[in-house]
């Protein structure tokens, strides 16, 4: 009965607690984990602990109810307060270096249909691995039109091996006993570029800035999921500075990381804190050029036409949903 009562109220307490002012400078937030559905108290307690871990892993300021295999989320609408924790970054960077030094081969992948944040952060990890003299490959499937201009700058170049980028269809053939799989910009197994790598390799590392979900990757030897970071590129840029002082980025490498931050922050207009600008400043010092990045991110005329065609044929449903009936062939590879 008590659970039904607070469910009907949609956990308004999570929002009400923010109005409490008793001399505190920062806004108070509340995280709640509730476990139910089991036959005994001890089991429900364990389920509640898992629900609390999930609530905190998603950034806090919310309630999570775990009822068997079903999970319900409430709250989590407040502006995320940035955690400027250099110590945490150093610890994660040191752990990453130790793991890489103990292994010989690195496979890096982001989410399926990768955007520029996924590409840039994967590139940053690749640079770290190569600095530590490790064999490294970035796993790719379909490449979007926004990523292609950046990717082309590394293909058929003397400075980079031909197998820097490998197809997800061939990724399994690169697995060795000492292979480390590093996942960036995603923490859900089924959304990765090649999920089977997670099952085939014992050593998995996850770096992501999205809130954890119920199907997050489990069993990772190192997991750094920071929902307060603006982007995966910001996180990786920070780690580059701590893994090795001798890492020097080429200008077009810095461009890719800068582009990832720029896109995920809408041109530094949202989720941009001190860490974001410090990472951007580091990349600018290594040659990232704002004008060059903006030109590379522009849509070409065919993309503009495809988007305009889709919008012109769209309809509003119940004043809230926009849908279009444009031919799929016109939109393949176009980032909307």
Residue ranges and their predicted role:
Residues 3-14, 37-60:
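Catalytic-core segments of nucleotide cyclases and related cyclic-nucleotide turnover enzymes
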Residues 13-24:
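Short catalytic/binding micro-motifs of nucleotide second-messenger systems
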Residues 23-49, 62-67:
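A short glycine-enriched loop-to-beta-strand structural element that forms part of the catalytic core
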Residues 42, 67-103:
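C-di-GMP signaling machinery
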Residues 90, 101-114, 121-134, 211-325:
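A structured phosphate/pyrophosphate-recognition subdomain
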Residues 107-171:
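Anionic-ligand anchoring segments at beta-strand to alpha-helix junctions in alpha/beta enzyme folds, i.e.
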Residues 162-219:
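Active-site cofactor/cluster-binding pocket
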Residues 323-335:
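Single conserved hydrophobic/aromatic residue that forms the stacking wall/gate
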């Amino acid at each position: 009965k008590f659970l039904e009562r607070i469910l009907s109220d949609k956990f308004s307490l999570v929002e009400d607690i923010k109005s409490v002012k008793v001399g505190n400078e920062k806004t108070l937030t509340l995280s709640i984990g509730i476990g139910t559905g089991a036959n005994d108290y001890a089991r429900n307690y364990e389920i509640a602990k898992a629900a609390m871990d999930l609530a905190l892993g998603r950034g806090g300021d919310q309630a999570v109810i775990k009822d068997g295999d079903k999970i319900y989320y409430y709250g989590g609408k407040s502006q995320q307060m940035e955690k400027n924790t250099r110590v945490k970054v150093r610890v994660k960077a040191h752990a990453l270096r130790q793991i890489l030094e103990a292994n010989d081969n690195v496979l890096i992948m982001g989410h399926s249909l990768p955007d520029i944040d996924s590409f840039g952060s994967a590139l940053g990890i690749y640079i770290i691995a190569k600095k530590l003299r490790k064999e490294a490959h970035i796993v790719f499937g379909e490449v979007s039109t926004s990523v292609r201009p950046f990717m082309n700058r590394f293909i058929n170049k003397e400075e980079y091996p031909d197998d820097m980028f490998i197809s997800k269809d061939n990724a399994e053939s690169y697995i060795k006993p000492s292979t480390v799989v590093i996942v960036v910009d995603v923490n859900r197994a089924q959304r990765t570029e090649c999920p089977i790598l997670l099952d085939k390799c014992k050593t998995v590392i996850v770096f992501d800035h999205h809130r954890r979900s119920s199907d997050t990757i489990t069993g990772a030897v190192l997991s750094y999921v920071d929902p307060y970071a603006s982007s995966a590129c910001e996180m990786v840029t920070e780690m580059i500075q701590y893994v090795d002082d001798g890492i020097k980025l080429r200008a077009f490498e810095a461009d890719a990381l800068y582009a990832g931050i720029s896109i995920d922050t809408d041109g530094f207009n949202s989720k941009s804190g001190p860490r974001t600008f410090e990472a951007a400043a580091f990349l600018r010092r290594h040659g990232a050029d704002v004008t060059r990045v903006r030109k590379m991110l522009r849509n070409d005329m065919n993309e503009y036409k495809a988007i305009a065609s889709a919008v012109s044929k769209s309809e509003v449903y119940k004043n809230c949903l926009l849908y279009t009936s444009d031919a799929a062939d016109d939109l393949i590879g176009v980032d909307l």
